[in-house]
From Swiss-Prot:
A molecular function (GO) term: oxidoreductase activity, acting on diphenols and related substances as donors
GO biological process, one term: protein repair
Name of this protein: Protein-methionine-sulfoxide reductase heme-binding subunit MsrQ
Cystine connections: none
Compartments, as annotated in UniProt: Cell inner membrane
Cofactor, how bound (note): Binds 1 FMN per subunit.
Keyword annotations of the record: Cell inner membrane, Cell membrane, Electron transport, Flavoprotein, FMN, Heme, Iron, Membrane, Metal-binding, Transmembrane, Transmembrane helix, Transport
Similarity-based family: Belongs to the MsrQ family.
Residues annotated as transmembrane: 10-30, 82-102, 116-136, 153-173
Subunit structure: Heterodimer of a catalytic subunit (MsrP) and a heme-binding subunit (MsrQ).
Length: 199
């Protein structure tokens, strides 16, 4: 049975809650001692992981809609992508304001150059920014065929963001490896699409 437009609307409501509730939890954890002895790192990792989760969810929509024969699922992809950008922005903001400090933002440029994993992170964020700004139907009409070409760059983020996570941790743990593996699996599902590009 295929999902109806009304069911998709309710699904979108649930996805908005999924994007917002982690923020409420984070505020609660900050104010009630729910973080570790290094709360700044906790906030950075939590926001970064949440952005990655929404990135993976965004990449999952197309193959899921195709294999499950639920074409209306595609309508949730933009919403998931926007939440990915929101959490990626919170991740970047937490680094800039909590790690560097508001009085040391001038150091951000040198930090990006001296730490390659930060370079990958900012490239990913800039791509997400471009995709967010052009996610409207108006932008799609204006860009025409170029719109799809631009939005295919999300696959670059699917490569760079997990590498950014892997590179940023001092001690390799299963979590970043799992995220990287899931990203590769979702990219592998698009093998035929990538193969057509290179013909």
């Amino acid at each position: 049975m295929r999902l109806t437009a009304k069911q998709i609307t309710w699904l979108k409501v649930c996805l908005h809650l999924a994007g917002f509730l982690p923020l409420l939890w984070l505020f609660w954890a900050i104010n009630h001692g729910g973080l570790s002895a290094d709360p700044v790192k906790d906030i950075q990792h939590f926001t970064g992981r949440t952005a990655l989760k929404f990135l993976l969810a965004t990449l999952l929509v197309s193959p899921l809609a195709r294999y499950a024969k639920q074409p209306l699922l595609i309508r949730t992809r933009r919403l998931l992508g926007l939440w990915c950008f929101v959490w990626a922005t919170l991740h970047l903001t937490s680094y800039a304001l909590l790690e560097l400090g508001i009085h040391n933002l001038a150091l951000l440029g040198s930090e990006l150059i001296s730490r390659p994993y930060l370079t990958l992170g900012i490239i990913s964020w800039l791509v997400l920014l471009a995709l967010t700004l052009t996610s409207t139907q108006f932008a799609q009409r204006k860009l025409g065929k170029r719109w799809q070409t631009l939005h295919n760059v999300v696959y670059l983020v699917a490569i760079l963001a997990p590498i950014h996570y892997l590179w940023s941790v001092k001690i390799l743990s299963p979590q970043p490896v799992i995220y990287a593996t899931l990203a590769l699996a979702l990219l592998a599902l698009r093998y035929r699409k990538f193969r057509q590009w290179w013909r």
